[in-house]
A protein has these predicted regions:
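Active-site acidic/histidine proton-transfer and metal-coordination neighborhood
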Residues: 86-183
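Acidic-and-aromatic substrate-binding clefts and catalytic sites of carbohydrate-active enzymes
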Residues: 20-28, 42-58, 75-89, 160-167, ...
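Acidic (Asp/Glu)-rich catalytic clusters
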Residues: 5-7, 30-38, 51-69, 89-104, ...
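Acidic/histidine-rich catalytic cores of soluble enzymes
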Residues: 145-234
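Long, compositionally biased intrinsically disordered regulatory segments in eukaryotic proteins
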Residues: 302-505
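Boundary/entry segment of secreted carbohydrate-active catalytic domains
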Residues: 2-47
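Hydrophobic faces of well-ordered beta-strands that scaffold small-molecule active sites
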Residues: 11-19, 41-45, 65-71, 104-108, ...
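Gly/Pro-rich active-site loop or hairpin
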Residues: 80-84, 123-133, 194-266
Length: 505
């Protein structure tokens, strides 16, 4: 098992791909790349089932190609992180994934998909405030201490047309990372979404200088590049992270500028993110990606282009035993209040003070939120074809009605990563609500209730089959010590989130 407490001790992996295990099919992707003389130096895979990751390591990815791991569902941005049992189970699962892939690190978005009981399909970025940075720093160190020697890379999230808080993005990540053994994942597209909110004028050179002057460069271990969309008809640049989309020229140019001009002494890997993209497009883009890396990055370039002395603010501590106490205690109640402000802004249209908000949160509400409820995790009429057919006989616009209902439901799932599960149970609750309020009545009511329960049960069964990854030690006498053992660290005052009602399913 790899032990890595310092990014400088991590292996230099080179130029690779970050992808999903299931689409595009990993074996087809690697075979096609090999036929085009484009074999990656390493393969990063997203969270899946342990058995599938093990199969990929042993039978799909050639033994000479290292694998790394892109985590999910470990929302260290959550004030309740230390106390929520789901995160202990997820940490145990992540360690199993790190074991079977042999990854020296786990990269994980600094974001959430559940905030104060509201469930989201898309990443919700943190509020850029010092109190939030302290919580993330504390929880990140806590998670890092449980990764059995592997390094945690905190990845900058995408900012969906807005950001909130008084810190700049770079200042925020400095406050999280400085004087810690944590690494950073720099996603160029995600960073562009933040840059366009902070800076009035864009050029690749200005973007690279912004990265150089504001981010903790010595913590950057991995760089990602993925698909990016630009919304039309907006008053300011509105960039949208979407790995299915092509990589636009502005993103290639920005990536090139960062590699060419920013001193990155801890950079060990650069990866093109290709999950959910068609293989012919991946072949073309990976060729371009490799050409840029070969031209603009040398793993030893920091010897020629070191950080200026006054820029060396991101020193990485070589051992967790040397960590100094936090300068200020993490204030959970303050962060919870900011979470409620974030929700009021995103979902209810509340307008915070201008100095607190960049961009336009209304764009999120109008262009993302409604679509993600109906589409993300599965198009609702595809998931519940018989149910939606029956409901549409009584409700003129099922989409609007369901989105409105979902918007009013406040919960946090017992496993706060599974949006499909939450959406499935919300659909059943929505139909029950329609029956209770007499929008559907008589024999039709009995029929639609039976139908939605049957379809929901099938979805949850299929989801457990495809995504279920129970701990193999859970059935041992005494259970699993990792899943059941509480996190230890500075005490937080958050209460565990309540379970999502199962409704008898």
């Amino acid at each position: 098992m790899t032990s890595s407490l310092n990014p400088d001790s991590l292996p230099c992996l080179g130029t690779g791909l970050s992808t999903d295990l299931y689409f595009p099919p990993l074996d087809d992707l690697l075979n096609t790349l090999a036929k085009n003389a484009l074999q990656p130096d390493f393969v990063e895979v997203f969270r899946g089932r342990t058995v599938d990751l093990k199969h990929a390591r042993e039978h799909i990815v050639p033994p000479a190609i290292p694998m790394t791991y892109h985590g999910d569902a470990l929302w260290y941005t959550d004030p309740a992180f230390e106390h929520h049992p789901a995160y202990r189970r997820e940490t145990c699962r992540a360690n199993r994934h790190l074991d079977v892939t042999g990854s020296p690190w786990m990269i994980h978005e600094c974001a959430r998909k559940a905030v104060s009981g509201r469930t989201f399909g898309y990443y919700v970025p943190p509020v850029l405030e010092p109190s939030v940075a302290r919580i993330i720093r504390q929880n990140g160190l806590l998670l890092s201490s449980r990764l059995e020697g592997r390094t945690l890379l905190i990845e900058i999230p995408p900012f969906p047309f807005f950001s909130m808080g008084q810190l700049t993005c770079g200042e925020f990540f400095r406050q999280i990372l400085e004087q810690t053994p944590l690494g950073m994942g720099l996603d160029i597209g995600h960073a562009l979404t933040a840059f366009c909110l902070e800076q009035p004028i864009f050029s690749p050179a200005r973007f690279a200088e912004w990265i150089r002057n504001t981010f903790p460069l010595e913590h950057i271990v991995e760089i990602h590049v993925g698909g990016l969309l630009s919304l039309q008809g907006t008053s300011h640049p509105a960039l949208w992270d979407d790995h299915r989309a092509p990589v636009p020229s502005v993103l290639w140019e920005s990536f090139d500028a960062v590699l060419a001009t920013c001193p990155l002494p801890s950079l060990k890997a650069v990866a093109l993110e290709v999950d959910n993209k068609e293989i012919p497009s991946i072949v073309s883009e990976f060729r371009t990606f490799r050409e840029i890396v070969r031209r603009s990055w040398s793993p030893h370039r920091e010897r020629r282009n070191p950080l200026p002395e006054d820029d060396k603010t991101g020193q990485v501590i070589s051992s967790r035993k040397n960590l100094s106490p936090e300068r200020q205690p993490a204030d959970v109640s303050a962060v919870e209040s900011l979470d409620f402000l974030l929700l009021e802004t995103l979902l209810d249209g509340k307008s915070p003070a201008p100095e607190w908000t960049r961009g336009d949160p209304a764009l999120y509400r109008e262009r993302i939120y409604t679509d993600e409820i109906w589409e993300f995790g599965g198009h609702l009429p595809d998931l519940f074809p018989r149910t939606i057919h029956l409901v549409s006989r009584f409700i003129a616009d099922p989409r609007t009605d369901f989105v409105s209902f979902f918007h009013r439901v406040a919960w946090t799932d017992r496993d706060p990563y599974d949006y499909l599960r939450a959406k499935t149970i919300a659909t059943r609750m929505w139909v029950e609500h329609l029956v209770q309020e007499k929008f559907i009545h008589g024999e039709a009511a009995k029929h639609v209730l039976q139908t939605v329960r049957e379809e929901a049960e099938q979805i949850l069964f299929d989801q457990d089959t495809v995504n279920g990854d129970p701990c193999p030690r859970a059935d041992n006498p005494g259970g699993c010590s990792s899943c059941d053992r509480p996190f230890t660290g500075t005490s937080l005052s958050a209460n565990p989130s309540s379970s999502l009602p199962d409704g008898g399913l």
